[in-house]
Amino acid sequence: MGIKYSNKINKIRTFALSLVFIGLLIAYLGVFFRENIIIMTTFMMLGFLAVLASTFVYFWIGMLSTKTVQIVCPSCNKPTKMLGRVDVCMHCNQPLTLDSNLEGKEFDEKYNKKTIKHTNIYK
């Protein structure tokens, strides 16, 4: 079985959600240090900053999501948003591309990196 790919927008949203829970956990750890006000306040502030960072990530991905290309997946016929040259469907994980040079090739997220040099086989 190959690597399980996920939609880029969903990956970023999952990261933001994990920041919320990590921030709450860090802030909750501060409760165990009630005797030392400095340590308790430090944990509470770090937790608050993690939750605040998740807010910024959610805002950023929301703004980015409005600028993405919206296409209809050929497999499930549901609308999905696509970031980059290659992505997968949000609903059925079907590999998608808008680049005609990549059609028929094996799906690889490395195609989205700018450092990849593509060789021209028609020379």
Swiss-Prot record:
The keyword Zinc-finger does not apply. Pfam families: DUF2614 (PF11023). Its main location: membrane. It comes from the Bacteria. The chain crosses the membrane at residues 12-32, 43-63. Keywords: Cell membrane, Membrane, Transmembrane, Transmembrane helix. InterPro entries: UPF0295. It is found in: Cell membrane. Belongs to the UPF0295 family. This is UPF0295 protein Bcer98_0460. It comes from Bacillus cytotoxicus (strain DSM 22905 / CIP 110041 / 391-98 / NVH 391-98).
